[in-house]
Structure formats: C-alpha cells, structure tokens
C-alpha cells in the first residue's frame, strides 16, 4: 500500500523508533562496507524547487547504496512552471518512478504530488515542515543521549519549518521543547495546537537563557531562511541577542549537545567556538541525514 511522509506526524512513535533502529543498522553496514542493494532497478525522482547540498547528495548516495537510481529534476526539467499541473506531473511520474522526493517552496505542492501519485512521496522540505531533517536529528540524539523521554530540547531562533517539525517530533517522542525567539517569530498556532493534541510539553520565551537553562539539546538555524532575504536587515536586528555562544552554553547541562540543520552563518546564529567545540554534534547530525533517509526510503519503497 502506498505511503507518504509529508509531516513528522505521519509517523508514530513506534515507527520512528523502528526507523532509527534501521538507520543505525544501515550506518553500521555502510561503515563496514557491506552491500545493501535492497532497491535494485528502482528509481527515485527528486524534485527541487529549492537548491540544497545535503538533501541532494544524501538522497542520491542513498539510492546508489541501495543499487537503485536517483533522478534530479529541477524547475527547468519539469513542465510545472510552463503550464502543466502538479496533478498531471504526479500521474506521469508515477508511471516511470518508484518514489518521489520533493523539496518545494509551498507545502501545497507536496500535498498535491502525494494526492495524485500512485507511488510514495517524501517531503524533503516545504515552507511548513522538514521531517527528513528531524529524523536525522533524532538519530543523532539517540546516539548521544540514548533516550528521548525527559530530555529538554531548547530551540534558539526562528520558529520556522524545521522548528515546526522539531516541535511536533518532540511531542511524539516525549521531550520537553522550549522555543526562544523574538516576538512575532513563534511557530504558527496550528503547530502549537497539534503539539498540544499530541500531549507535548512545550513553552515559548523571548529569553534564550531561560530556554537553554539545564538543556540537554540546544538547536539553532539561520536567522534569514531561503525566501526571507527581503527581511534580512530586520531579522538580523531582531535576532541579534539570540546567538548560540559559549555564554549561552554556560547555563545548559555540561553534556549539552549543540545542533544545527545547516547551512550555518558562522558569527550570526552560532559562533565558530561553539560550532567547532566539544559540545557540537553538527557534522555527525549532517551525516545522519543520509542514514535516516535511507531507512525512510527503504520503508516506503522496498
């Protein structure tokens, strides 16, 4: 039966644990050089409306490791921008491919792709959520903390799409989620209501130190996301006191892990000292995108 993952809430707690176990096994096999050609003769179409280093490379490598093929499709390669509907594109690609991964400007696009395709669709980033990132993040948290329940997850910065998925994912997995952001940059009410319905324990503050106090995880992201460039001057001013630096780490637990979905703007949302410091797990986190996405691809396309 066709299955799509457009939101982290499309997965249950049990399924997330299963995916993380599968990801750990796939990571171990890759390090050992063991063959994992589980998707021979299968093809994944990768639709990119937004460019990305990590997303493209990790999905292409994943399909290569599985003995399959990944096909890169940007706005110049498909006809959506020249009059063909998303619905017709979804139906057409379903006849060629075994799965679709989409990194899009609007969440409505990935929802339409899922609705009208007969093959699995993965949201690899939309303006609303980024479930693939959070699966990689959760794999990293599991490696370093070996649990979720009872951990304090401090989000420092913009209540953006990654924050939305982290908020919902934390609610599913039983972590306390504290968001520190300037007024007006909170996650949307819809996501806060969803987190509440999931039984999530969360709060919002405009004081980074309140959020970071006794935190097990400190997470940040760029202050100016792709598409927000027109607001750059205002955002840099508004987020000026929300930098993740050694002073902020000083109020967290000594073994706090620092995370960032990348790309980072060093010297803005995070300092070099923290990003390259002993508490940073940022590059392990980036690698784990590959393994977590491999587990997800396998679950949906095998």
Curated annotation (Swiss-Prot):
Reactions this protein catalyses: carbamoyl phosphate + L-ornithine = L-citrulline + phosphate + H(+)
Pfam families, alphabetized: OTCace, OTCace_N
Pathway in which the depicted protein is active: Amino-acid biosynthesis; L-arginine biosynthesis; L-arginine from L-ornithine and carbamoyl phosphate: step 1/3
Protein keywords: Amino-acid biosynthesis, Arginine biosynthesis, Cytoplasm, Transferase
Class of enzymatic activity (EC top level): transferase
SUPFAM superfamilies attached to this UniProt entry: Aspartate/ornithine carbamoyltransferase (SSF53671)
Record-listed E.C. numbers: 2.1.3.3
InterPro entries cross-referenced by the UniProt entry: Asp/Orn_carbamoyltranf_P-bd, Asp/Orn_carbamoylTrfase, Asp/Orn_carbamoylTrfase_sf, Asp_carbamoyltransf_Asp/Orn-bd, Orn/put_carbamltrans, OTCase_ArgI
A GO term, aspect molecular function: amino acid binding
GO cellular component, one term: cytoplasm
Compartments in which it is found: Cytoplasm
Entry's family note: Belongs to the aspartate/ornithine carbamoyltransferase superfamily. OTCase family.
Stated name of the protein: Ornithine carbamoyltransferase
Organism per entry: Methanosarcina mazei (strain ATCC BAA-159 / DSM 3647 / Goe1 / Go1 / JCM 11833 / OCM 88) (Methanosarcina frisia)
Lineage: Archaea, Methanobacteriati, Methanobacteriota, Stenosarchaea group, Methanomicrobia
Gene: argF
């Amino acid at each position: 039966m066709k299955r799509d993952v457009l939101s982290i809430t499309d997965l249950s707690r049990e399924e997330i644990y299963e995916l993380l176990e599968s990801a750990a096994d796939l990571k171990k096999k890759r390090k050992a050089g063991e063959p994992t050609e589980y998707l021979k003769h299968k093809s994944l179409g990768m639709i990119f409306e937004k460019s990305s280093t990590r997303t493209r490379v990790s999905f292409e490598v994943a399909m290569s490791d599985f003995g399959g093929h990944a096909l890169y499709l940007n706005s110049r390669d498909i006809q959506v921008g020249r009059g063909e509907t998303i619905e017709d594109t979804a139906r057409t690609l379903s006849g060629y491919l075994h799965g679709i991964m989409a990194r899009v400007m609007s969440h409505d696009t990935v929802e339409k792709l899922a609705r009208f395709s007969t093959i699995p669709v993965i949201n690899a980033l939309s303006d609303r959520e980024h479930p693939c990132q959070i699966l990689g993040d959760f794999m990293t948290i599991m490696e370093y903390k070996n649990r979720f329940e009872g951990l304090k997850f401090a989000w420092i910065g913009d209540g953006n799409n990654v924050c939305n998925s982290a908020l919902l994912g934390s609610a599913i997995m039983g972590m306390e989620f504290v968001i520190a952001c300037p007024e007006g940059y909170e996650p949307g009410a819809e996501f806060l209501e969803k987190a509440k319905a999931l039984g999530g324990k969360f709060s919002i503050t405009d004081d980074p130190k309140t959020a970071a106090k006794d935190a097990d995880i400190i997470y940040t992201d760029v202050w100016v996301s792709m598409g927000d460039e027109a607001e750059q001057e205002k955002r840099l001013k508004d987020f000026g006191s929300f930098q993740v630096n050694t002073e902020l780490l000083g109020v967290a637990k000594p073994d706090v892990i620092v995370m960032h979905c990348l790309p980072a703007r060093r010297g803005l949302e995070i300092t070099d000292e923290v990003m390259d410091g002993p508490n940073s797990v940022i590059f392990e986190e980036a690698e784990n995108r590959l393994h977590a996405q491999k587990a997800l691809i396998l679950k949906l396309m095998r």
